[in-house]
Amino acid sequence: MLDTRELPLLRALAGRYPTTEAALSEIGHLRAILSLPKGTVHVVSDVHGEHRKLKHIINNASGSLRPLVERVFGDRLTAAEERALLSAVYYPRERYARVASHSEGARWAFLIWTLAREVEVIRALSLRYTLRQVEAAFPEDMRGLLRELVSARATLGEGGYLDALLDPFVQHGREIEILRATARAIRNLTVFELVVAGDLGDRGPRLDKVIEYLMRQPRVRVVWGNHDVSWMGASLGQEALIATVVRLSLRYGRLSQLEEGFGISVAPLDRLARTAYADDPAERFAVRGEGLRDALLMARMQKAAAVLQFKLEGQLCRRRPEYALEHRCLLHRIDARAGTVAIDGEVFPLLDARFPTLDPGDPYALTPDEAACVALLKESFLRSPALSRQMRWMVQQGTTWLRRDRALIFHGCVPVDGEGELLPFVVDGEVRRGRALFDALERTVRRAFRAGAQEDVDMLWYLWTGPLSPMFGKDRMTTFESYFVADERTHRETKNPYFHLIHDAAFCGRVCREFGVDEERGLIVNGHVPVRVERGESPIKASRRAVTIDGAFSEAYGDKGYTLVLEASGARLAQHHHFTSVEQAVEAGEDIIPVISDVEVYEAERRVGDTEKGEEIEREIELLERLIEAYRDGALLEQPR
């Protein structure tokens, strides 16, 4: 019996499917999708601003395009031809530039040779998709042309119909657009979805270019990490986070992402460094990288930003006592005359006791010059259209956790105690644990961008550094100690017990159950904590139910990285190595050929119907069945066109 309360929803659905036949056709299409092998999902993490390496890994589908080409062509291509074809798929513009100055005949020969082989690859990939899905993978402006190329039985280069389709592009010097479209179609069909498990920026050169390239991909989801929420909070004007991201940009010599990428001027900090820190050697603040500014000036700017960060964090901790982070405010524990600081009841000598802007009576107060600097930086962050656009995309495409078939993906940890019991944290006045905590924090982040309440914006700072933040998961962030104290005991950041417990299969099963993932076969996927392979660590934990894919992607931390490949046949881990340059990839055919290891091989191929996407499709089918019932009962009238 049709529930009349459903009618508004069904009436809206009727706009898309105005007849019974239209609804039945869509049901058939959806049921066909359920029977297909599930799409390949690639999961990467902790990119940390390495835009060139990320672009290559996306372009070569984490190394899976090379074996695909080998399977399609067998021994029909020489090694040189295979490299030429792959470079045209990875970098069509740069590859074509090598022949752009040649004669029209040579350009035509290159176009036909490349297109014929790319079309063959597309046809092979199309076998795993419906026709509608294949066409959706084609760039919209070129959809009709690619449809003809892929479906035609004629051969390119033999004259006639297909060559006539291409001829106008050659005449107008636009053949590169065809090559770009086919290359993109291959990449889109090879990887159904890209998931980035957090920490897109900091350390590496350009966060802005990382996000810009991700924004151009067809299907991307982001699981927020603590470095992501720091930039998100800074874009909303959270002052402690503004100081933090500026300090980190200076620490790694990455001012170009601020100044060129986001149009944010650091001139106010430059002025503060030249005045308040004019004679400061700032030896503890040497820049890890190169920049256009004088190295000593950048060190002084970094110190000025660090002191601003510590002051603003102290103000925030006093404003938000519920965070229970008062013990991490250390400026009032400095004895400037003795050159010491008290930490956890023990006194340590300071490596640098020059604090020209510190008032012993009110150490967290900003001087007038500091207040002016913060105000100008804040205005610059709030007025950056590029930063706002990219951070709002991060909110739109982002989440605190994600399920993909049997994989449970989140950046850091589920906060637990030593026994593996879920730890409580109060959000919106209610105690939350486990999945409820993740979901409540996600609502807070979205509300911060929607309404901008200071309480919500401040929560992004806690997510960056708080012990019960699922994105951080350590007892403390020892930034002050690493700058100012030699004793390495004070530098220690103790990880949440979660990171040890994921070696236990039973614990992993409980975590999966908490998030509605298969308790017996679920796989936990994290980033955040770099895998130190040189120390004998493995990304695949002893439980074989958890994998950490922070492989030190950035040059500053190892220049490796992992992609977890979730295929219909199983889960595999691809370990990447150093990427030299686009020029080497095009000129010499250099590639990142990953080392592949199996995480799990499935007994039977996983279908779309076995996954969470299948559950969504089943709900769509149920709604369409209700629409057909409404047409049959006369509750809604069909509207044949």
Curated annotation (Swiss-Prot):
Coiled-coil region: none
Carries keyword Glycosyltransferase? Answer: no
Record Pfam families: FBPase_2 (PF06874)
Q: What biological processes does GO assign it?
A: gluconeogenesis
Q: Which domain of life is it from?
A: Bacteria
| Stored Gene3D superfamilies | 3.60.21.10
What this protein catalyses is: beta-D-fructose 1,6-bisphosphate + H2O = beta-D-fructose 6-phosphate + phosphate
Keyword set, alphabetical order = Carbohydrate metabolism, Hydrolase, Manganese
Organism name: Sorangium cellulosum (strain So ce56) (Polyangium cellulosum (strain So ce56))
Pathway(s): Carbohydrate biosynthesis; gluconeogenesis
| Protein name per Swiss-Prot or TrEMBL | Fructose-1,6-bisphosphatase class 3
The Enzyme Commission number assigned here is 3.1.3.11
The Gene Ontology terms for molecular function here are:
fructose 1,6-bisphosphate 1-phosphatase activity
Give the record's family classification.
Belongs to the FBPase class 3 family.
